[in-house]
Amino acid sequence: MKLKEKTQEQLVAEAFAIFNGGEGLDHWSYSSTSSPMAKNLISYSFLEKIRRSWLWRYKPSFGNLVNNTVQKLIADVIYKSKTIKETEWDRDYQKCFDSELDEINKKDPVDKKDEFARKEMISYAHDCIGVTKKVVQDLVGDEKLVCEQYVKHKEMTMIKPITGRVDYETKTKFIELKTKPPNIRKVKNKEEWTMSSQALPTEPATDNLTQTSFYYMCTKKIPYLIYVNDKEHITFDQSHELMKKDHLEHLYFKMVEKILLWERMIMFCKGNLSELAQMCEPPDMYHPFYYKDLAPEQEKLITNLWGIKHE
């Protein structure tokens, strides 16, 4: 008796079952595809609830603290999910700030150094919020401001769409905001640390431009890429060569090409994570940030897939 051939939908589900603990993958995002494939596999092969339990250092938390507080202070609409949005909430500064800080403090610091940084960053965050709030308001003016709007795009023969959330958006423009958290350094010959402002870039970074390009292709609105720290900001708009339409489109399609390649590799391996791991470059354990502060589950997976033991 001839076995019934699997449908394309079944083949896709089987191949993508390597993600989210067997539950599969609904979509790609810029953040999930901006790193090497090995980094993607040791993160997104785990269930979301496991990923959310992992500890991370203060810098991402600083960005959330600043951006989320500013949004609560000045937004007209904030999307909480793809379909649920809010228009009314308590806009008291201290309450907005404290609620975000409480979310951060639900997780323990990574270590003593991170514990110091998490406390020390608070004064920097207050200053950064002031800078961010002003630059966004000056740019938005009287337009209705929508934050965290979900967007989705799918090109050519892509299997899964790319999704994202826009930081700040009006009828005519959008803003991709990048906070530059303060840096922390160890005091020589002491178990002490100091914190200082991080300088802003003089040119837009390619990874930030690529993320901006995705939102541009989704919205077709005037793009702004803004960097802020606790002292100042720098804005890149379409007057900058790298922010022009042609270059943003180029970066977007480079991202799409990468995703298409990944999808072909995933389909070829038919749900075999070990086989897929051998098709991509092994993790560079000396990379300055991709493989720092790994969870025990991630270290074990790296050893199982590539034979690399974490030191």
Regions found by a protein language model. Give the residues of each.
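Generic recognition of stable, solvent-exposed alpha-helical segments in well-folded globular domains
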Residues: 61, 65, 207-210, 257
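Short amphipathic alpha-helical face segments that pack within enzyme cores
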Residues: 65-68, 210-218
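Non-catalytic protein-protein interaction segments used by genome-maintenance enzymes to assemble
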Residues: 151-211
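Metal-dependent nuclease catalytic cores that hydrolyze phosphodiester bonds in DNA/RNA
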Residues: 1-165
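A structural signal for short, well-ordered beta-strand segments and their strand-loop junctions
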Residues: 146, 169, 173-177, 223-227
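Metal-dependent nuclease catalytic regions and adjoining charged, substrate-binding loops involved
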Residues: 204, 217-311
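Short acidic (Asp/Glu) and glycine-rich catalytic loops that position anionic groups and cofactors
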Residues: 44-49, 179, 231-236
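Short loop/turn segments at secondary-structure transitions that flank enzyme active sites
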Residues: 72, 76, 181-183, 229-232
